[in-house]
């Protein structure tokens, strides 16, 4: 690969795992996939979990290990959020399933449906028959955020694997590998900021790392929060723990609201900060989270005003005074 092309390639693609052993987190599920690769007989499967934790990548790694050199011809990947309708099942998927290929003995073609929970009910119903007719030659892998949006008849035909959110340690491990390979200048608070904003989403973490390097060169907390354009947690923490309500409201108005952060930005960062407020008693912290949650609910209902946030701070200030 030329240096120019390497620079243009997003790091999330450049450092995408190629084998199952390279995937971080969800060890038990990855162990099951490695056993499937070893046995050589892949069942239909549904992999569910939040975005950016390696669901689709895991299926590609499994396909690489099962099909070897036949991978390019033997795998069809469709993003079901784009190709959602019944025509895709009748045309692309059916034609691929009918196609004759010379694969290693005992191996099957693989159809990967990313974001399968976005498929229409009609398309999912049509897929039932296709799966039955071509199960001898083709296996299906569904990657989705919510497995309950896959119709019951498809679920009953599949092994269901659930991926949990990646831990901060898992995300940090992969970031440090990339930082070493790319010779990135960073500070510890910069890494903490990337992990904080990613919330267990590896894809988001790697994209934020590359964006910060491209935009500022140095990965520190201030640069990361400028890139991701979310409220700085230290400012939010100061707002939540201010000794009097007037100071809290002043921080909200001057450092957050007037700088253009939305109600959702402020309330979600407040939630993440509050979860980790070790200096606040757990009982008080839980009440604070409850108030933040109620405010979040009102904002999602369409009342995302400054007044809602000020009311939230007044209630949190009252809780802090009781403590």
Curated annotation (Swiss-Prot):
Q: Which UniProt keywords apply?
A: ATP-binding, Cell cycle, DNA replication, DNA-binding, Nucleotide-binding, Nucleus
One Pfam entry name: Rep_fac_C
Task: Cite the binding residues for ATP.
Answer: 12, 24, 49-57, 145, 203
Per its UniProt record, what CDD domains does this chain match?
Answer: AAA, HLD_clamp_RFC
Query: Which cysteines form disulfides?
Result: none
Predominant localisation class: nucleus
Known InterPro entries for this protein?
Answer: AAA+_ATPase, ATPase_AAA_core, DNA_pol3_clamp-load_cplx_C, DNA_Rep/Repair_Clamp_Loader, P-loop_NTPase, Rep_factorC_C, RFC_lid
- SUPFAM superfamilies attached to this UniProt entry: P-loop containing nucleoside triphosphate hydrolases, post-AAA+ oligomerization domain-like
Miscellaneous: Present with 2760 molecules/cell in log phase SD medium.
Name the UniProt record assigns to this protein: Replication factor C subunit 4
